[in-house]
């Protein structure tokens, strides 16, 4: 009797990894002594609405700060001036046959002009934009890591850090 040993299982095929660098920010406007930030709504792959901070990929020879200013303007309609760095968020996701390692650099921006609008978003990712009081933003932002960035902005503005 001939016995055949079971074939060893093939290890799972690893997806190729792609590195992405983005920048965005917390753009602040003070109205009636209340600090507000502009947040955008997007639909995720499952079709659910997610409220998040404006951000996007670095283009050509842009600096991270230039990317943050451009992305905030494109996705919210608000022109801003960078006041400082708020930190970095890193996360992984998979899509289109790759694993993506994304690093997002966030900046605190002061609103200097413009009007809330999603009309300038070239990718048409934003479906809505709103001013939210900074002290209430934790209940509006979908992602905990972005709530942490908003908290850093709050502390920075309050002079705590």
Where would I find each of the regions flagged by the language model?
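N-terminal strand-loop-strand
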Residues: 2-53
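Generic detector of short, locally flexible boundary/turn motifs and exposed helical patches
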Residues: 2-7, 17-20, 44-48, 69-75, ...
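Compositionally biased, intrinsically disordered low-complexity regions
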Residues: 26-30, 40, 89, 115-116, ...
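Residue-level marker of positions within ordered structural domains that often coincide
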Residues: 30, 112, 155
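Unchanged
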Residues: 58-148
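Short, charged, intrinsically disordered terminal tails
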Residues: 143-145, 149, 154-161
């Amino acid at each position: 009797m001939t016995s055949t040993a079971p074939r060893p299982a093939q290890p799972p095929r690893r997806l190729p990894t792609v590195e992405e660098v983005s920048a965005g920010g917390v753009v602040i406007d003070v109205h009636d002594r209340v600090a507000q930030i502009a947040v955008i709504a997007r639909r995720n792959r499952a079709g659910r609405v997610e409220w998040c901070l404006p951000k996007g990929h670095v283009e050509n020879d842009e600096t991270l700060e230039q990317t943050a200013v451009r992305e905030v303007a494109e996705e919210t309609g608000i022109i801003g001036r960078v006041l400082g760095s708020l930190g970095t968020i890193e996360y992984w996701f998979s899509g289109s046959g790759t694993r993506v390692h994304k690093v997002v650099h966030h900046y605190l921006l002061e609103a200097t002009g413009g009007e809330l609008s999603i009309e300038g978003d070239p990718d048409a990712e934003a479906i809505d934009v709103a001013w939210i009081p900074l002290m209430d933003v934790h209940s509006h932002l979908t992602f905990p890591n972005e709530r942490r960035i908003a908290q850093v902005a709050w502390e920075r503005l309050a002079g705590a850090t």
